[in-house]
Amino acid sequence: MAVTVENLEKLERKMTLTLPLNTIQSEVATRLKKLARTVKMDGFRPGKVPMSVVSQRYAYSVHYEVMNDKVGEAFAVAANEAKLRVAGQPRISEKEDAPEGELAFDAIFEVYPDVKIADLANAEVEKLSAEVSDAAIDKTLDILRKQRRTFALRAADEPAQDGDRVTIDFEGKMDGETFAGGKAEDFQFIVGDGQMLKEFEDAVRGMKSGESKTFPLNFPADYHGKDVAGKQADFLVTVKKIEAAHLPEVNEELAKSLGIADATVEGLRSDIKKNLEREVKFRLLARNKNAVMDALVTNAELDLPNASVQAELERLIENARADLKQRGIKDADKAPIPEELFRPQAEKRVRLGLVVAELVRANELQAKPEQLKSHIEELAASYEKPQEVVRWYLSDNSRMAEVEAVVIENNVTDFVLGKAKVSEKAISFDELMGQN
């Protein structure tokens, strides 16, 4: 087999392959004979169809199949011998000027780039830190108490206030007509919890049981109901029942109800702090990891294989369609999604993947067995039966591959932070959690 490789633009290459014609013909004949032993045709017994008939019927498809197989095998062998790291699938076409007795093909393809990472000592990375404060523990305690709150009927002359559960009938109209979803009976919500629009809650707050009120309400322009978004409606609301919330005290009983081993107030707060610290650790790791990855992309030079970018584009668009379908969007699989919407993201992902792969290879940052074990145990620690979670991960190769990818990213993060110019920045617990 004769092979030549020509450099085209940037990462593009052209390989010319020459194969003996008799190799193709011999394989076609072998496959046709094998096919003749099992093929079924009207008028013939199984395995008794004449070769001339089998050849007439199947020669073209078998020849096409053999050509694909042989050329694909030849390309793979030649690329391996030439130490070419092929990105994507080659575009193969037959040449017309092949020497007699031979078949010649051109394969145009891309190779993965050489990745040049600048000196990481000059890279700048902002590393975040955060602590679990007493205020964060108190806020979590309040959430836990609200989840276990009970309600008692208010006196008839007591107005609705924040935290109360109200039962109402309401009807909203536009131009005198009730709109879809604008009417309900015995509807319940907690005043001040943000379940309803602020204008609606403001109108109900202060009303008493048995009271009715009519008021205008302006729907926001970005309201999820497109038929009413940006419009004004007139609502009639009748309050049927008001119930005041009663939160459990922070005591041993609450600790017991939450399944805390040390069923004391101190034990409860300690358990909450431990869980919050675990969450803080994971969130800080994610934020700092993103900062490191951004620094890596900035400090690397490389060309991107179009084949890899296109494959990533198609994956992102497919994910977008699946998301639309999950949201109940009609004909989501046919919705036109411009590639350019996702191109920057696809290019960044491909670039980052190539840079990380090179950094891992050059610095031996692969995941070690003890790291995988430690990470799985850490993930499982927050569950009631951690050993079952550990077994769940270990029993599936795809789940283990995900764990391995995370550990490698963590190794890369630690490696870069150990080399780069790192500036420390302390942020509040609420800022880290995205809370106001």
UniProtKB/Swiss-Prot annotation:
Keywords: Cell cycle, Cell division, Chaperone, Cytoplasm, Isomerase, Rotamase
Domain PPIase FKBP-type, residue spans: 163-248
Domain of life: Bacteria
Keyword Coiled coil on entry: no
Any one GO MF annotation of this record: protein folding chaperone
Single biological process term from Gene Ontology: protein unfolding
Main subcellular location: cytoplasm
Enzyme class, broadest EC rank: isomerase
Annotated catalysed reactions: [protein]-peptidylproline (omega=180) = [protein]-peptidylproline (omega=0)
Gene3D superfamilies: 3.10.50.40, Trigger factor ribosome-binding domain, Trigger factor, C-terminal domain
Gene Ontology CC entries for this record: cytoplasm
Compartments where located: Cytoplasm
Enzyme Commission code(s) on record: 5.2.1.8
Free-text note on domains in this protein's UniProt record: Consists of 3 domains; the N-terminus binds the ribosome, the middle domain has PPIase activity, while the C-terminus has intrinsic chaperone activity on its own.
Stated family: Belongs to the FKBP-type PPIase family. Tig subfamily.
HAMAP family reported in the protein's UniProt record: Trigger_factor_Tig
Function: Involved in protein export. Acts as a chaperone by maintaining the newly synthesized protein in an open conformation. Functions as a peptidyl-prolyl cis-trans isomerase.
Protein name: Trigger factor
Protein species of origin: Polaromonas naphthalenivorans (strain CJ2)
Annotated gene: tig
